[in-house]
Amino acid sequence: MQPQRVVITPGEPAGIGPELVVQLAQRSWPVELVVCADATLLQDRANMLGLPLRLLPYRADQPPVPQQQGTLTLLPVVLRKPATPGVLSTDNGHYVVDTLARACDGCLNGEFAALITGPVHKGVINEAGVPFTGHTEFFEERSHSDNVVMMLATEELRVALATTHLPLKAISDAITPALLREIITILHHDLRTKFGIADPHVLVCGLNPHAGEGGHMGTEEIDTIIPVLNEMRAKGMNLSGPLPADTLFQPKYLDSADAVLAMYHDQGLPVLKYQGFGRAVNITLGLPFIRTSVDHGTALDLAGKGKADVGSFITALNLAIKMIVNTQ
């Protein structure tokens, strides 16, 4: 693989994201790591942890080079207010969004081959006056994508979501034939192009207990899910379901599957996070670029103490590199 540039956003400056990025610099990488962040923030966290860090200037006019141990390439975005580990400040809500916007725009214009995001604090961003539902929705809107799919993955399991951050009472109405067609199409396409799976097999959850029990526990399966699955199978997609979510996550089903499509957030993700928390990666499918993320939050109570585990960030970066290779 020719060296590529990967852009990283550390996320909430008062959280563990900045120090996790500093920990990424403690090894060499086959790609150039361009960090969209405040220089003083990164140096201060490196000093707190007692870790070496040299920040190199980002030069868009120069070809990318593999990142050497102890260094990061800096694309500067200045904090509105100095950050104290563990202490949120609404003054920096706009800073977080600025880093996301610059990183996203760089992916859209071809500067970067992939984007890896650290954890943000949605509450403080909204309190700063910036409407923000999450990374997935932000990148969908900024890239003018018609629709995107949130998927979490470990080495053993991939779970995509038909709906993301919705209250339970809104989910049934949200799962329309048009939505399901689009979600399944994106999932099938990206499993082939970004994951290199020639004929992906997807297990599809029902919405209701026992996948509706033949209409006795809800009719969404009969009215919506089954007709769409039949339609997509006729186009050559390898889909099984709808299957009851309480029995789907068994080896006899998962051993032959490349991904699971859950109907809502808390239907599929508890199983994945129980199995692989700290080793899981959040991936946004359907974007015109590769985006992966850690599977944990800002952990304000750990910030600046050197106790945060960099494992999920490393996994997210390694997966992004694999996806870059698959798309070349």
From Swiss-Prot:
Main location: cytoplasm
Gene3D superfamilies: Isopropylmalate Dehydrogenase
Assigned EC number: 1.1.1.262
One Gene Ontology MF term: magnesium ion binding
UniProt pathway: Cofactor biosynthesis; pyridoxine 5'-phosphate biosynthesis; pyridoxine 5'-phosphate from D-erythrose 4-phosphate: step 4/5
Leading EC class: oxidoreductase
GO cellular component: cytoplasm
Subcellular location: Cytoplasm
Co-factor note (free text): Binds 1 divalent metal cation per subunit. Can use ions such as Zn(2+), Mg(2+) or Co(2+).
Record-listed substrate binding positions: H135, T136, K273, N282, R291
Keyword Oxidoreductase part of the UniProt annotation: yes
Needed cofactors: Zn(2+); Mg(2+); Co(2+)
Annotated a divalent metal cation binding sites: H165, H210, H265
GO terms classed as biological process: pyridoxal phosphate biosynthetic process; pyridoxine biosynthetic process
Keywords: Cobalt, Cytoplasm, Magnesium, Metal-binding, NAD, NADP, Oxidoreductase, Pyridoxine biosynthesis, Zinc
Entries under InterPro entries matching the protein: PdxA, PdxA_fam
UniProt keyword annotation of NADP present: yes
Catalysed reactions, semicolon-separated: 4-(phosphooxy)-L-threonine + NAD(+) = 3-amino-2-oxopropyl phosphate + CO2 + NADH
Family assignment from sequence similarity: Belongs to the PdxA family.
NCBIfam families: pdxA
Summary of subunit composition and partner proteins: Homodimer.
Misc note: The active site is located at the dimer interface.
Function per UniProt: Catalyzes the NAD(P)-dependent oxidation of 4-(phosphooxy)-L-threonine (HTP) into 2-amino-3-oxo-4-(phosphooxy)butyric acid which spontaneously decarboxylates to form 3-amino-2-oxopropyl phosphate (AHAP).
Protein name, per record: 4-hydroxythreonine-4-phosphate dehydrogenase
